[in-house]
């Protein structure tokens, strides 16, 4: 009888999360990317998946689940087991913009997920047609104020629209948002002069800037980007409050056991210290966001509050 009881007790203990977590991870993990293959976010995720797998000793398999502004991928993680084997490549759009722009969003970025760390952040850049008379931010604001009708400004996501709304509020100007489904068509219209100006990520516009196909006006970082030292920041151009980055992070379900979360966070910090990571971020023109889980949580909450103020001021409602 005692042998049977002891065996039963051991079986129950072995089945418990606390016992099972001792060997985490003992099988491959998967990383859900809520965006399509080939995007900058996808390349970012695949790099960190490979490096994280190397540290953990288990493969991290990437699964792209695009659609509905990232909602499909977010829900795939929300409905997965909370065991740490399903990772979410989160981003500023899915974690901070969607809650402000999508009505009846089926997930809560703060209640349904918890961060492991930040991954990377990248600057945005204001661009104009190559033959535009606008050469700097002062020219841009002056032209917007003198224009008899609001200028046409290209964006291709709600996050970029919010970025422009914030700048317009600071500068005291009006604009007409021209939304695109992707950057390619928007770039074509900037080059062709069918848009007065546009906002995009610096990575996507880098080659167009280098070849003179678009004219850079200013970048949104807190300092100039080393590869383009002649492009001033918006901050130094008279708007010290304006610092804006697109960013990505790694999250899991909110009810994932703390020791699993801690092991993932520790592994990711080791990835940040590798030379391969420094080389990747340089190539990708992004910066590391080597945050602790607590630091990333604080950052996300501050970003949500900042963007909420912008959306409220612009009258943007979820739809």
What does each model-found stretch correspond to?
Residues 79-85, 100-185, 234, 247-280:
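Hinge/capping helix and adjacent helix->loop/strand transition within the periplasmic-binding protein
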Residues 26-28, 169-170, 235-236, 258-319:
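An extracytoplasmic/periplasmic, membrane-proximal ligand-sensing/linker region
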Residues 38, 92-93, 121, 129-134, ...:
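Short coil/turn segments
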Residues 108-118, 154, 174-179, 196-197, ...:
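Short beta-strand->loop
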Residues 1-26, 319:
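Short, low-complexity disordered leader/linker segments with a strong preference
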Residues 94-104, 161, 165-170, 197-231, ...:
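A ligand-binding cleft/hinge motif common to bilobed small-molecule-binding domains
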Residues 20-111, 149-151, 159-160, 172-196, ...:
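N-terminal (or domain-start) structured segment
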């Amino acid at each position: 009888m005692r042998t049977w009881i002891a065996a039963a007790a051991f079986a129950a203990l072995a089945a418990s999360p606390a016992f099972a977590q001792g060997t985490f991870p003992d099988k491959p993990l998967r990383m859900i990317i809520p965006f399509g293959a080939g995007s900058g976010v996808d390349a970012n995720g695949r790099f960190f998946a490979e490096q994280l797998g190397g540290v953990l000793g288990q493969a991290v398999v990437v699964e792209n689940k695009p659609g509905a502004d990232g909602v499909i991928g977010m829900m795939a993680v929300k409905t997965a087991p909370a065991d740490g084997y399903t990772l979410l490549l989160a981003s500023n759009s899915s974690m901070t913009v969607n809650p402000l722009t999508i009505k009846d969003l089926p997930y809560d970025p703060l209640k349904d997920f918890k961060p492991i760390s930040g991954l990377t952040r990248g600057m945005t850049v204001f661009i104009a047609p190559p033959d535009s008379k606008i050469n700097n931010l002062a020219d841009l604001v002056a032209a917007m104020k003198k224009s008899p009708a609001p200028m046409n400004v290209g964006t291709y996501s709600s996050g970029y629209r919010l970025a422009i709304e914030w700048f317009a509020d600071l500068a005291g100007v009006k604009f007409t948002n021209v939304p695109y489904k992707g950057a390619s068509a928007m770039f074509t219209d900037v080059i062709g002069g069918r848009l007065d100006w546009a906002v995009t990520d610096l990575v996507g516009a880098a080659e167009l800037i280098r070849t003179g196909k678009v004219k850079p006006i200013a970048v949104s970082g807190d300092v100039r980007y080393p590869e383009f030292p002649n492009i001033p920041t918006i901050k130094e151009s008279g708007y010290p409050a304006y610092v804006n980055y697109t960013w990505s992070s790694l999250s899991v379900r909110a009810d994932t056991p703390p020791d699993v979360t801690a092991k993932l966070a520790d592994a990711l910090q080791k990835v940040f210290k590798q030379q391969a990571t420094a080389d990747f971020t340089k190539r990708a023109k992004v910066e590391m966001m080597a945050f602790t889980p607590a630091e990333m949580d604080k950052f996300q909450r501050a970003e949500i509050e900042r963007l909420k103020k912008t959306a409220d001021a612009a009258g943007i409602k979820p739809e």
